[in-house]
């Protein structure tokens, strides 16, 4: 069982909110995207990515009702419904191939993000208004006791369990490729925003998928760089552990980022896996 709550804020500097997210508890799915600041129609790219991922999962992974609506500094409504689909791979269902090292859910996420990439690129090529738009994306899906995470760009997913918080994703950035796992050095580097891989910029993007088994009670944090760019891991973990509920956790993360002077849009989704 998945419970989740999300908050997004335009912030005090950007004229529009180019972050977007969706939660579907029935599908055990959370998706967060960050349209790149300075690019044309970044908010359109972020929305397209989230919708494409959620729509593909709903169509191929489960039956589902409407997913949600536009949000601004508030949580997306939590919608229920859906049934597990355990059918084997079918011809034509995996246009980007089937990775046998991944679970069915992992392959669904991988395919969904590739489809989002194609849709955004085709829209950008066909319109001067949307030329150059692109986005990051991080999507988490739980199937049984397995967590599958698909991601591109620098939107992150953290897992808080026991006495540890771990970053499960790795940023697609020039700084991360040079500095590795030194998160503080990355945060302070003047080129920290230079991304090496995004959704919608080229015909084939690199989609990363990581999976692990859950035991129950784990807290998942999906955040854009407007949040993790100003809050170090210690602060993120403290806020996550101090929150009494998911709404408070997500709200505290965004509020703290804004209080620390974040100049970007800020989005945080807090989700908890509850073993049946």
Model-derived features: positions:
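PP2C/PPM-type serine/threonine phosphatase catalytic domain
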Residues: 1-276
